Every structure is written in structure tokens, then in C-alpha cells.
Amino acid sequence: MGIRKILCFVSCACLLFLTACGGGGGNLSRGESDGNKGSEESMKKGVTIITPEENAEVSLMNELVENVVKDYEPGKTYDYINKSEGDRYFPESVKFSRSGGEGDYRLLISRNKDMTQAKEYDFSSSVTEVSDLFCGTEYYSSVVNAESGEESDVRRFTTKKGPRTVKIGGTSNTRDIGGYETADGLTVKQGLVFRGGNPDNLTDGGKEWFKKFGIKTIIDLREEPSRKRTLISLGINYPELPAKGCACYFHGDLSIRDNECRKGLITAVKVFADEKNYPIYFHCQIGRDRTGTLAYVINGLVGVEHQDLTLDYELSFLSEYGCLDFEQKDVESRKQNHYAATEGLYSNFMKYSISKKTEEPSLKDGIEEFLLRNGVTVEEIKSIREILTGAK
């Protein structure tokens, strides 16, 4: 009897144990379901952008350009000229890093908080760099796993205001003329107009740059025998300028007084009045003086002030091409000539504004009056301003 009681007790205990396990199994199943739900919620946040941090401000300017821009005054760039070092203006990329392990990830960057019109970049590596952002701009970013749909939270960052330099293989002295603020509180749009040296010997990468940025028009400011239409196979338009080419910044207002050079300048300015011509790349031989003159006139016309216009010109001296035609020992004399040239150009346009007898003469009004007297129409000027700044 004692043995049968013991066996009965053991059997009952086993039955209770199995029943308990069965019930526990049911709870475990529910727990797994809840856990999966929690994992799914965690997974959405399992991939995150580590850098840039939320609300970070990043600079697209390298340290040298930052130093020039800080507390800039006309002539400052001459203190940094070093011909032996070649191009030193190249932009900094924005570095992004993420969590999430290996996989087919995509980085999305948009200027809209709802991530509409986002540009997509490969983010398969845990670190990637982006080099085609605008300066002085608010951005939003997120990362998504292309296979699972796993997506990070949206993160905000801004880029610092300043010149937007670009790197184009096979040429030099290249940058966007946008990003500058006007006296009216507007900002010149970026991605529409680029300036630089001649594109006669571009690398394959340089040619890809023109494709990537969708350049539709190239304005060659050189004299006729020097002009080469090396990218016409890409369907790029080359407007015809007078044989003598365009006015030259380094000669101040003297070249603008030259009838043929003035005609070249006016012809080039008119190209900017037609929205179908954008994006535009304009150049001379080394991208400094004739190119600098046109940049001065276009940005001055939309309201950029003299100091920023001279900064844009002086950035040429951080490039290989911008220093080709003088020796390092001649830097000081070049600096003095530069002062005379820039002030001569400024004074010439201010005379046009003063001649209108307005209460507050300005460079913007002076350039406008100069252009009107030489064949550019009111409608063309209005169009240029609207295209480049949104001014109505």
C-alpha cells in the first residue's frame, strides 16, 4: 500500500507539472507575441543616424576657406597665397555614420521636414560622405534598410553659411556663385550658376560632374581663337560672344569702357535672363578676371554687396589656376593692383547710380543702370533677379 500511494502521488505530481507547463507554454506564446511586437517597435529605432547629431551645424568649407571668410576684408586672401600648394579651396564632405549592422541601407536627405523630394545616397557601409549639399541650408535626414523597410527617426542638421566651392576633375578655381545674401535680405540660389577655369581638359570624373549637375549652358568668355566646345557632345549650349570676349576684372573699369569687351559682357548677361539656360557654367582661361567680372555684375545686379563680391573674386587665389600668371614674390604688388581694380569697378558702377540722383545710391542700382544703357532690358533684369533670388 505504501508503494502504491507513493506512485499515485508521483503520478499526480507529474500530471500537475505537465498541466502547469502547458499553461506556461500558452503564456510564453503570448509573451513571444508581445516580445515580437516590442522587437518590431525597437527595430524601427534599431537603425539610427549617429552623426551628424540632432540640430548640428556642419561646415562645407575647409579650414583655410573658413579662415579667409572669418572677419573678411578686401585683400585678406593675399595673405594666404602659396603657389606651390595648388588647389586649396576644395570643400569638406559631410560625414554620416549609422547603427544597424550590415545591409543594403540608403541615406535620405531632404530640405523638407516631411522628407519629400529627398535625395538618396548609398549607405551600405556604416560611414558615408556626402559632398553635394548647399551652404547655409536646413536639412533633414533618415536612413532606411532597403530590404526590410526598417527606418530611422528623422534628424535635423544645418550647413554653415559661406562660399560653396566645388571640385571638378581636370580644371581649377571652381565654385557656385550662390549662397550670398543680398542687401534686401534675400539669398542667391545655389546649384544654378557655377564659375571656374576652362574645361578644355576635363577628366572622366570632371565630365561626369557636368552631367550630374545638369549643366545646360557654358559661357566661354575668352577671345574667339581660344574657345573650345569640348562638351558639346553632352548637348550643352554655347552662346556666341563677340570675338574679343568679355571685360576683365583686373583692369577695373578700363575694360568695361572698351566697346568690344562691353558688348561681350552684355551678351553674357542676357544669357542669365532665360530660365531655360540654367544651370550655367561660365569661365575664361583661368577663371579669375573675366570670369570674376561677370560674377561681380550678376551677383551685384541681384543685390550682393561689394565686400562679398570681392571675397568671391579673391577665392581664386586659393586655386592653382588663379595664381598661374604671377610669381610668389609679386604677391604684394598684385595686392595693390587688386585694390585699384576692385575699387575702380565699384566706383564706375556707383557713378551710374549717382547719375540717377536717387536718395540712396547703391551698387545694385548702378549695375542696373549700366546694363540698361547698354542694351539689357528691364524685363531681362527682372527675370535674372527672379530666377536667382526669387525677387518679384
Across the structure, where does each feature detected by a protein language model lie?
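Cys-dependent protein tyrosine phosphatase-like superfamily
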Residues: 22-281, 294-392
